[in-house]
Amino acid sequence: MNVENVLGQIVALPPDWHGAGSLKSGVLRAIARHAQGLDLRCTAETGSGKSSLLFSHLAKRHLVFAMDDGNGSVRRVQESPLLKPGVVEFIEGPTQKTVPAYAFAEPLQIVMLDGPHGYPFHHLEYYHFYPHLAAGGLLIVDDIDIPSIHDMYKFLKKDEMFELIEVAHTTAFFRRTAAPVFDPLADGWWLQGYNKRKKIVDWNPAAVAVALVPRPLRKALLKRLGR
């Protein structure tokens, strides 16, 4: 079955087909479009649904980190005739436990974050996935209209590891650049684009100088202020 054919069948599934909600057709089409030209040896997502069916036809191997939560959503995907056999590995359970415990054996060409949406769970998933995302691969972040996830979206837009290539409905698509992997075991907050300028929360002159003045000029200004 070719991708365009299966995509049409997936899009035609009713909106309530998946017990935990479904991606809009525009998002599914964007996934298929951005996957073109990529050698998808291994992809991964948190959450399951129509995207899982689509990835089973796009990738040689696909990892699904999800749990039913009593609504039968994972089983519905597993039993769908649109799921390509032998491609998808289901790692069931809370992603707060399953993602950190998983031993990734190869780079990932696409990662989609659509698991639990409460803070800090998206951020936890990102932390454990980003070192494994291959250069040129895709990071897909769903539900960026949720404030805490929108904060992640704003962070990623300024990070040198990622380039925003599309927002479809409330789903953001980032391409992994060739920038080095940010050390997941270090600090280096000052190296990250989102953190280049501190927020002003203390309005005394010295604090304003630290927040706004470039580091090379800061010492001289603080000296003039008598600090």
Feature roles, as predicted:
Residues R29-G226:
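S-adenosylmethionine/decaboxylated-SAM
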Residues M1, G226-R227:
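C-terminal end-of-chain micro-motif
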Residues N2-L38:
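Class I SAM-dependent methyltransferase Rossmann-like catalytic core
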